[in-house]
């Protein structure tokens, strides 16, 4: 009986701690909507730059938004032409048509960066000179 009472108190304490920790972690990062990030962005590496249009038009997959741009430049940057993108709480992911990630761009103080195992680094940033609704 004493063990059962102690166990219930301990389980309640653990549940309280997890709810506090989980609640603060969940509220620290916000998932932006596609409409907040849509528009023309500049994608670049050390050799090339191209404009990419992030839209708020969903692909048939449902959780991915369409992406448009210069197919030759995009194929050079990603190894294939990406079809879409999706926002994440700490960046954005460029995807193929099925939603598989081709690159994750982490939102850092100096910009949005994707780093690859082969040492390549891509940067993407909003094009401030273009209209949001293009």
UniProtKB/Swiss-Prot annotation:
One Pfam family here: Inh
UniProt xrefs under InterPro entries: Inh, Inh/Omp19, Protease_inh_b-brl_dom
Gene Ontology CC: periplasmic space
SUPFAM superfamilies per the UniProt record, alphabetical: beta-Barrel protease inhibitors (SSF50882)
Signal peptide (from-to): 1-26
Keywords (A to Z) from UniProt: Disulfide bond, Metalloenzyme inhibitor, Metalloprotease inhibitor, Periplasm, Protease inhibitor, Signal
Localization annotation: Periplasm
Family per similarity comment: Belongs to the protease inhibitor I38 family.
Role this protein plays: Inhibitor of the alkaline protease.
Protein name according to UniProt: Alkaline proteinase inhibitor
Organism: Photorhabdus laumondii subsp. laumondii (strain DSM 15139 / CIP 105565 / TT01) (Photorhabdus luminescens subsp. laumondii)
Gene name per UniProt: inh
């Amino acid at each position: 009986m004493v063990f059962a009472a102690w166990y219930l108190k301990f389980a309640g304490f653990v549940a309280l701690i997890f709810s506090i920790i989980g609640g603060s972690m969940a509220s620290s990062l916000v998932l932006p909507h596609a409409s907040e990030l849509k528009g023309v962005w500049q994608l670049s590496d050390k050799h090339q730059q191209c404009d990419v249009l992030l839209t708020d038009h969903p692909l048939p997959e449902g959780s991915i938004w369409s992406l448009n741009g210069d197919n030759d430049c995009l194929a050079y940057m990603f190894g294939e032409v990406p079809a879409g993108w999706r926002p994440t709480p700490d960046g954005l992911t460029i995807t193929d048509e099925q939603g598989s990630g081709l690159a994750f761009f982490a939102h850092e103080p100096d910009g949005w960066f994707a780093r690859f195992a082969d040492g390549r680094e891509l940067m993407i940033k909003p094009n401030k000179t273009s209209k949001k609704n293009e």
